[in-house]
């Protein structure tokens, strides 16, 4: 069964997937989402967000006053929450589906990948490099407590962010998150 077919459980502080018996996202990630949004919104231009989750990063992206904010989401329950969240936000475009198979996308000043149960992560480097504008920035969820570059970007640096995660099943992070920063 693919992630998009799983029935999720939502609470104030997390999204839970009972099929795989783990969290999809938790609110302890707020400092990570805030710093990620600040990084990719460097010029308040056009932003592409892959995965909506709890909407934490989307709130911070909107707070930056960006020109446009395109969000691609695959999971129908999260998509429903995304549509409610986006109501009245004229600079938001929602695309339903798998980011790796969407055609006709524009180019963007910033790209943020934070998906769950994604089977196409091996395509992220080529995809993001083809969609980011010259001078653009890319970041992605780093599930390790170290500098980690699974996509083999040539120019990546890291900002260390102190976090205090609740006990969870989905990450190896204990005290520090290393936010990857790809600047082109």
Describe the residue ranges of each PLM region.
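Class I SAM-dependent methyltransferase Rossmann-like catalytic core
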Residues: 1-45
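Conserved SAM-binding loop of SAM-dependent methyltransferases across substrates and taxa
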Residues: 54-66
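Conserved SAM-binding motif I beta-strand of class I
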Residues: 68-73
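A short acidic, Gly/Pro-enriched loop at the edge of an enzyme's catalytic core
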Residues: 100-111, 115
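Conserved class I S-adenosyl-L-methionine
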Residues: 43-53
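C-terminal substrate-binding/active-site "lid" region of AdoMet-derived donor-dependent transferases
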Residues: 78, 119-184
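Conserved SAM-binding strand-loop segment of SAM-dependent methyltransferases
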Residues: 89-98
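Conserved SAM-binding loop
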Residues: 82-83
